[in-house]
């Protein structure tokens, strides 16, 4: 059997994306909460009214996202904290396009959050997740439209006697087909890992900048 077919697929949620009320359906106003807190600007910093700072618009991007994540270890991982210590290295080691960084790492954490045990080497344990979906992402990244991107991340790390081999691959291409919101793919928590927090808690620990409105994630620049 093809190795990729052994990876666990997400169950596709067919909930339609709510259409914005503005005339331009690719944009929404920035919500007034970021990370659950009230803010007066997109940077969560107080500013003088006389400065006339213009808040960036929230944009909709529709992509076909194909991505997979595999993590091979020499010991079974039992708690999220141990898992998170290894997967979070990418926050410092990411070497791709900086404009795409918030989106790519968001998908990376979705995969890490949904990873399952899959067949692997006889002398180790392998976890994996596979994503191949037509996806809507709302964001407030001015330079980002529906550009295509291809990124790979391969990393080895030793932490507390546990060896991790991490492989992450993602391809994103623009689509005009019917899509599902990215938040519909993050309902399931990691299998067998104790003390797995809510996904928003994981994003906060990784210092993501995002807002939530009506259950919709809006991804901001780092």
Curated annotation (Swiss-Prot):
Carries keyword Membrane? Answer: yes
What Gene Ontology terms for biological process does this UniProt record contain? Answer: viral budding via host ESCRT complex
Supply the InterPro entries for this chain. Vesiculo_matrix (IPR009397)
Keywords associated with the record = Host membrane, Host nucleus, Host-virus interaction, Membrane, Viral budding, Viral budding via the host ESCRT complexes, Viral matrix protein, Viral release from host cell, Virion
Motif PTAP/PSAP motif mapped to chain: 46-49
Q: Where in the cell is it found?
A: Virion membrane; Host endomembrane system; Host nucleus membrane
Q: What terms describe the molecular function in GO for this protein?
A: structural constituent of virion
Q: Name one GO cellular component term.
A: host cell nuclear membrane
Q: How does it sit in the membrane?
A: Peripheral membrane protein
What is its biological role?
Answer: Plays a major role in assembly and budding of virion, by recruiting cellular partners of the ESCRT complexes that play a key role in releasing the budding particle from the host membrane. Condensates the ribonucleocapsid core during virus assembly.
Subunit structure and binding partners = Homomultimer. Interacts with viral nucleocapsid. Interacts with host TSG101.
Record remark on domains: Late-budding domains (L domains) are short sequence motifs essential for viral particle budding. They recruit proteins of the host ESCRT machinery (Endosomal Sorting Complex Required for Transport) or ESCRT-associated proteins. M contains a PTAP/PSAP motif, which interacts with the UEV domain of TSG101.
* Annotated protein name in UniProt: Matrix protein
- Please spell out the taxonomic lineage of the organism that makes this protein: Viruses, Riboviria, Orthornavirae, Negarnaviricota, Haploviricotina
The gene name reads: M
């Amino acid at each position: 059997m093809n190795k990729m077919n052994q990876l666990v697929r997400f169950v596709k949620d067919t909930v339609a994306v709510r259409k914005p009320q503005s005339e331009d359906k690719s944009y929404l106003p920035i919500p007034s909460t970021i990370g659950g807190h009230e803010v007066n600007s997109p940077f969560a910093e107080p500013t003088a009214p006389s400065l006339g700072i213009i808040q960036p618009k929230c944009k909709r991007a529709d992509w076909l996202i194909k991505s997979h994540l595999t993590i091979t270890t020499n010991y079974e991982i039992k708690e999220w904290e141990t898992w998170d210590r290894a997967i979070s290295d990418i926050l410092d080691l990411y070497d791709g396009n900086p404009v795409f960084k918030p989106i790519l790492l968001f998908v990376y954490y979705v995969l890490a959050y949904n990873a399952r045990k899959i067949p692997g080497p006889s002398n180790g344990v392998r976890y994996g997740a596979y994503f191949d979906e037509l996806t809507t992402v709302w964001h407030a990244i001015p330079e980002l439209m529906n550009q295509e991107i291809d990124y790979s991340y391969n990393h080895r790390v030793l932490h507390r006697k546990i060896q991790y081999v991490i492989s992450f691959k993602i391809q994103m291409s623009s689509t005009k087909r019917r899509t599902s919101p990215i938040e519909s793919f993050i309902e399931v928590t990691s299998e067998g890992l104790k003390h797995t927090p809510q996904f928003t808690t994981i994003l906060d620990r990784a210092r993501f900048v995002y807002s939530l409105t009506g259950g919709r994630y809006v991804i901001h620049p780092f």
